[in-house]
Amino acid sequence: MPEGPSVRKFHHLVSPFVGQKVVKTGGSSKKLHPAAFQSLWLQDAQVHGKKLFLRFDPDEEMEPLNSSPQPIQGMWQKEAVDRELALGPSAQEPSAGPSGSGEPVPSRSAETYNLGKIPSADAQRWLEVRFGLFGSIWVNDFSRAKKANKKGDWRDPVPRLVLHFSGGGFLVFYNCQMSWSPPPVIEPTCDILSEKFHRGQALEALSQAQPVCYTLLDQRYFSGLGNIIKNEALYRARIHPLSLGSCLSSSSREALVDHVVEFSKDWLRDKFQGKERHTQIYQKEQCPSGHQVMKETFGPPDGLQRLTWWCPQCQPQLSSKGPQNLPSS
């Protein structure tokens, strides 16, 4: 699924539509009927990690809400490119279970909300958007087929939801799951792209006696971090993905957190500048030093298994005898 930098970009694309009324709807969503948005006003947009939250109200009145993400060294002053390419056919990764997911905590029971029905008139209408593997948002345009499918047909991706607004523009949502939800309670201290990201909390999590590649994907401590960031940060910190956090020196754990934040911010900045993502190990056959890259699926016994790329020479596996320093990058 799209990682933190991509969802931040989606938030930036949606934000100009806040304060506008939905005048026409469309899309293929069956659990949440597109017609439910007719005549509603988009009043707020919030992002946390890999999730986007949109608030809709039946009237034009707006409450002052601090919904914008923390600016990252002025990059929000740059104009976003209005298109996010949707790659390939619709596909979604399995979502992690509630244990250890670290998702925003609802402020009241979600049982009062229904996937396909709008909440009662006195309830805030918060739409929770979870993007699939090729999830995207397009502005004032539709995604087009880049290649033929397995049957040889050139079929354009089918949008899950299309919202036309009173200002004349429209938003198109692809490959995502949507549901009405209670108002989100956002915790920026675990968001890797927030200026309030809590390094101490992250370092403490990384000191656990479990493979660091498991801990990095725990959204309770690294919200917004996905498989690409995991692989890149581990390689740049020269840490083997199965190294136990308790066996790493404090300086190695600090270097890993540094690379997580640095790569995430650089990736987001590249998105806003229309540049290609630059990876060193993810989906590579050789590392930058010319060594053969290994690929294997790792994950907790009862959790999601994820493809992992690493270089055995640049990222040697440690013994479990105690904290060890790793080769510097």
Swiss-Prot record:
InterPro entries recorded:
DNA_glyclase/AP_lyase_DNA-bd (IPR015886), FPG_cat (IPR012319), Ribosomal_uS13-like_H2TH (IPR010979), Znf_DNA_glyclase/AP_lyase (IPR000214)
Main location, first listed in the record: nucleus
Annotated stretches, region: Disordered: 88-112
UniProt-annotated location(s): Nucleus
Q: Which cellular component terms (GO) are annotated to the entry?
A: cytoplasm; microtubule cytoskeleton; mitotic spindle; nucleoplasm
Could you name the domain of life of the organism this protein comes from? Eukaryota
According to the UniProt entry, how is activity regulated? Acetylation of Lys-50 leads to loss of DNA nicking activity.
| Residues carrying N6-acetyllysine | K50, K150
Function summary: Involved in base excision repair of DNA damaged by oxidation or by mutagenic agents. Has DNA glycosylase activity towards 5-hydroxyuracil and other oxidized derivatives of cytosine with a preference for mismatched double-stranded DNA (DNA bubbles). Has low or no DNA glycosylase activity towards thymine glycol, 2-hydroxyadenine, hypoxanthine and 8-oxoguanine. Has AP (apurinic/apyrimidinic) lyase activity and introduces nicks in the DNA strand. Cleaves the DNA backbone by beta-delta elimination to generate a single-strand break at the site of the removed base with both 3'- and 5'-phosphates.
Domain comment from the record reads as follows: The zinc-finger domain is important for DNA binding.
The text of the family note is: Belongs to the FPG family.
Return the protein name.
Endonuclease 8-like 2
List the lineage, top down. Answer: Eukaryota, Metazoa, Chordata, Craniata, Vertebrata
**What gene is behind this protein?**
Neil2
